[in-house]
Amino acid sequence: MGMKINAELPLPANLKAEYPLPKELAEIKKKRDAEIREIFEGKSDKFVVIVGPCSADNEDSVCDYVNRLAKVNEKVSDRLMIIPRIYTNKPRTTGEGYKGMLHQPDPDQAPNLLEGIIAIRRMHIRAIKETGLTSADEMLYPENRSYLDDILRSEEHTSELQSR
């Protein structure tokens, strides 16, 4: 299998500076992270519910969904903490086919990893801004986490782990 480097990615700190998480949204994330920690440490009676589709590849549709989920969250927030799952990668056994927004932010265009990372940052930031809900994403490529760790909660896994 051949590999061609089309361009170098910027350093995560540089990309975060160019597409920053506004301070008021960073405070929301900090508060929600603390709430999640309290739940997992048994200091809260709430349950965490991570919910969302298997693929998030359209910003407007995703944000519409998260806005509707935020309304549900308002009704159950005394018992549950809802975390939208905004899954921006699609695992492929053979490596063929659409691999998700990370690789190809526009399914009708050629893959572009940098544009994908930017699109994901924008989408997650918009979701927080519109709803106050921070998101979870699944990182198929843990090295991408450093581009998004200020915005979302992530779980790193492989398809191999899923089959155990």
Where are the predicted features?
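N- or domain-start disorder-to-order transition segments that initiate the globular core
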Residues: 2-43
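Generic N-terminal targeting/processing segments that precede catalytic cores or assembly contacts
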Residues: 28-46, 61-75, 82
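A generic, well-ordered mixed alpha/beta core segment in the N-terminal half of proteins
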Residues: 67-146
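Conserved, mostly hydrophobic/aromatic
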Residues: 52
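Short strand->helix junction
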Residues: 55-56
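Conserved small/polar residues in nucleotide/adenosyl-binding loops
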Residues: 156-163
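Terminal, contiguous helix-loop blocks that mediate binding/assembly
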Residues: 148-150
